[in-house]
Amino acid sequence: MYLLIPAAGMGKRMGSDRNKLLLTLHGKPLLAWTLLAAMESRAIIWIGIMAQPEDFEEIRAIITPINALKPVQIIQGGETRQKSVYNGLQALPEGAETVLIHDGARCLATPELFDRCAAALATCQGFIAAIPVKDTIKIVDSKGWIEDTPDRSRLWAAQTPQGFQVKLLKECHEQGRKLDWEVTDDAALLEKCGFPVKIVVGEETNLKITTPGDLAIAEYILSQRL
């Protein structure tokens, strides 16, 4: 299984002017925790990291002490997550048939989650890790008035990894570029192209580090694991 990690974003909501994946969590950069879990996964054999050139040196410095037993390639990232994943798909080794895409900011994903997700591609063309929504969700208009309350039993919070057949995902990305679609995850491209996407149950602790509060929660979760 091949793994692509989008890592080209900035940490604006973290109040930082640098790539948030280079920030420290429990003594290591966020990206290091993601890589360590990927290294322990039995299914993953190759890792590609899409990043901006100004971060290449720091990312190499993160990779080196991990003593990676699997090939890790740094790939030029794009202006958006969507464009970064497109670049990553073009850089996959020849013969890659399936791929996992995992946000580097979800640095608490476990090796077991990677392995379960990899296995899911034996039964579908595309899937996302997700967990059932616990809170009641409200649809609100631009002025703050509630318009609707969707049935919570049908709502799931999307996570990563997300996994796909490489050929199909490339075709959907090309269609998205042709029609100028803008999406926030790769599953949305398959949906817009009319392909079904399956749910694989994710992990409650697989949160995305977006704000300083998320970082504090992640510190606590890691302290309980180590």
UniProtKB/Swiss-Prot annotation:
It comes from the Bacteria. It catalyses: 2-C-methyl-D-erythritol 4-phosphate + CTP + H(+) = 4-CDP-2-C-methyl-D-erythritol + diphosphate. Its EC number is 2.7.7.60. The record marks 152, 208 as: Positions MEP for the nucleophilic attack. PROSITE patterns: ISPD. SUPFAM superfamilies: Nucleotide-diphospho-sugar transferases. Gene3D superfamilies: Spore Coat Polysaccharide Biosynthesis Protein SpsA, Chain A. CDD domains: CDP-ME_synthetase. InterPro entries: IspD (IPR001228), IspD/TarI (IPR034683), IspD/TarI_cytidylyltransf_bact (IPR050088), ISPD_synthase_CS (IPR018294), Nucleotide-diphossugar_trans (IPR029044). The keyword Nucleotidyltransferase applies. GO terms for biological process: isopentenyl diphosphate biosynthetic process, methylerythritol 4-phosphate pathway. Keywords: Isoprene biosynthesis, Nucleotidyltransferase, Transferase. One of its GO terms (molecular function) is 2-C-methyl-D-erythritol 4-phosphate cytidylyltransferase activity. It is an enzyme of class 2 (transferase). Pathway: Isoprenoid biosynthesis; isopentenyl diphosphate biosynthesis via DXP pathway; isopentenyl diphosphate from 1-deoxy-D-xylulose 5-phosphate: step 2/6. The record marks 13, 20 as: Transition state stabilizer. NCBIfam families: ispD. Belongs to the IspD/TarI cytidylyltransferase family. IspD subfamily. Catalyzes the formation of 4-diphosphocytidyl-2-C-methyl-D-erythritol from CTP and 2-C-methyl-D-erythritol 4-phosphate (MEP). HAMAP family: IspD (MF_00108). This is 2-C-methyl-D-erythritol 4-phosphate cytidylyltransferase. It comes from Microcystis aeruginosa (strain NIES-843 / IAM M-2473). The lineage of its organism: Bacteria, Bacillati, Cyanobacteriota, Cyanophyceae, Oscillatoriophycideae. The gene is ispD.
